[in-house]
């Protein structure tokens, strides 16, 4: 199966030309949405029996879609989308950075992708199923799902959490600001869950990898700040981190 996905990574030239026209300040989710939609125009699904192959093709091309746009719009580089990496996570990092990732980075990326893929019913998968219920094609279903995932209350939660964490330079400042947010009844992203009531089992896994990344780069701010935020929210509101927080 890995060999099959590797054989499906190449992007059509017409899709590359579209990606080159997307502005550099576009949101990556918008780029993926447009990329999948354009792929559907170029490789139109002809029958229901093709849907597994179409799904594999989309899965194989998404890393190249986002990285081709990013490297061209930011660096002026037209990347070669095929690499010798076996995993999707490794290929994505390789294309993004222009060099093969180390083992830790590959592991973290793959763990992250697995944790999100193995999650339960959510807004984006619901959107995809609504599209599928009308017998729409796979590209339309995935395009709709990406549009749903684009929202700040869904896929944007980890982005919002990171924006918050990056503002603080110490655990003490983080605690002070978190208490202020709670007093003002501001929404704090990355905590609580609609289904999980006691804890999010994904958080226990990604938190370990987050700490390993922090240790690798000698981080003395982001991870300690994140841990303090987790402690404050549990102490004050009995709210636990969901998967998005330490993914950030």
Predicted feature locations:
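Hydrophobic alpha-helical bundle cores within soluble ligand-binding/oligomerization subdomains
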Residues: 1-248
């Amino acid at each position: 199966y890995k060999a099959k996905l590797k054989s499906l990574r190449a992007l059509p030239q017409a899709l590359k030309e579209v990606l080159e026209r997307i502005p550099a300040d576009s949101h990556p989710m918008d780029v993926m949405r447009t990329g999948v939609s354009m792929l559907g125009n170029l490789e139109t699904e002809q029958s229901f029996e093709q849907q597994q192959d179409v799904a594999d093709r989309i899965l194989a091309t998404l890393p190249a879609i986002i990285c081709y746009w990013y490297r061209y719009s930011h660096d002026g580089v037209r990347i070669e989308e095929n690499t010798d990496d076996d995993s999707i996570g490794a290929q994505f990092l390789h294309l993004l950075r222009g060099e093969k990732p180390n083992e830790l980075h590959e592991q973290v990326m793959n763990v992250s992708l697995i944790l999100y893929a193995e999650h339960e019913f959510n807004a984006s998968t619901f959107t995809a199923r609504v599209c599928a219920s009308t017998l729409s094609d796979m590209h339309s279903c995935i395009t709709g799902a990406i549009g749903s995932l684009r929202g700040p209350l869904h896929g944007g939660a980890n982005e919002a959490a990171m924006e918050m964490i990056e503002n603080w330079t110490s655990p003490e400042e983080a605690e002070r600001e978190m208490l202020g947010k709670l007093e003002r009844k501001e929404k704090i992203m990355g905590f609580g869950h609609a289904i999980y009531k006691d804890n999010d089992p994904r958080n226990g896994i990604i938190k370990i990898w987050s700490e390993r990344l922090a240790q690798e780069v000698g981080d003395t701010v982001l991870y300690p700040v994140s841990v303090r935020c987790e402690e404050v929210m549990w102490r004050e509101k009995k709210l636990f981190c969901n998967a998005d927080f330490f993914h950030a």
